[in-house]
């Protein structure tokens, strides 16, 4: 995730300063509860939808994918691409190009997607606000607004939707300074499903004609 004000009157800020501090504490507490809940899972499997929209530019793109996570390891299927992280290296398989890119954890830090960072990304670089609560498909979803501490950030703010019953992440919305809105929604979540011992093992012999880029 790369990419989080204007007050019309000082008196408005003063009036709500105390309430803001309280809701920020509540928001941080809720996020910590979610992080603890997710960290306790042995495995997670879920589908997700991803929507990128910019009405000014008349852009709307919708995609979906599936991910399996165990501790730091994960397997991601997205846009026809398979990405596997085995705890040491990341393997990105692109069937369309018959190409495989292999990077170490250190090399891959600054690009690509690391779903496990969803647990802790909020802990640094953000201020928190308690936002709206909605009922979605019968589930109470509480949104927390995350505002980047860095004024030069490309992100205006994030909205993290929390399922208040399961204490899980349901939706992540990112609003950029240029008006682009991206929405990631999680569905069909399965917890603690037993996995094969080699589920996150990459076998290059399965791709005999692929170009290996490492």
Q: Model-derived features: where do they sit?
A:
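Gly/Pro-enriched, hydrophobic low-complexity segments
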Residues: 129-212
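N-terminal leader/targeting segments and the immediate start of mature chains
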Residues: 17-59, 72-73, 206, 211-214
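An acidic-aromatic
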Residues: 64-112, 182-183
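Flexible, surface-exposed loop/linker segments and immediately adjacent secondary-structure boundaries
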Residues: 105-139
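Beta-turn initiation residues at beta-strand->coil junctions
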Residues: 52, 94-95, 173-176
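Extracytoplasmic
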Residues: 41-43, 62-64, 71, 85, ...
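Bacterial Sec-dependent N-terminal signal peptides
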Residues: 1-27
């Amino acid at each position: 995730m790369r990419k989080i004000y204007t007050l019309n009157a000082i008196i408005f800020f003063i009036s709500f300063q105390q309430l803001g501090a309280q809701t920020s504490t509540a928001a941080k507490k809720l996020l910590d509860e979610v992080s603890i809940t997710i960290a306790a899972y042995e495995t997670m499997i879920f589908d997700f939808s991803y929507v990128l929209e910019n009405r000014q530019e008349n852009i709307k793109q919708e995609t979906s994918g599936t991910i399996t996570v165990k501790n730091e390891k994960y397997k991601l299927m997205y846009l026809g691409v398979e990405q596997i992280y085995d705890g040491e290296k990341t393997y990105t398989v692109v069937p369309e190009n018959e190409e495989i890119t292999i990077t170490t954890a250190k090399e891959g830090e600054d690009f690509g997607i690391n779903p496990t960072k969803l647990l802790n990304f909020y802990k640094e670089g953000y201020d928190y606000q308690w936002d709206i609560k909605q009922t979605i498909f019968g589930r109470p979803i509480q949104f927390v607004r995350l505002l980047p501490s860095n004024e030069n950030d490309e992100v205006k703010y994030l909205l993290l939707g929390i399922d208040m019953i399961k204490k899980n992440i349901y939706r992540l919305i990112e609003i950029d300074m240029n008006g682009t809105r991206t929405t990631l929604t999680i569905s069909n979540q399965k917890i603690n499903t037993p996995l094969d011992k080699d589920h996150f093992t990459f076998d290059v012999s399965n791709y005999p004609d692929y170009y290996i880029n490492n």
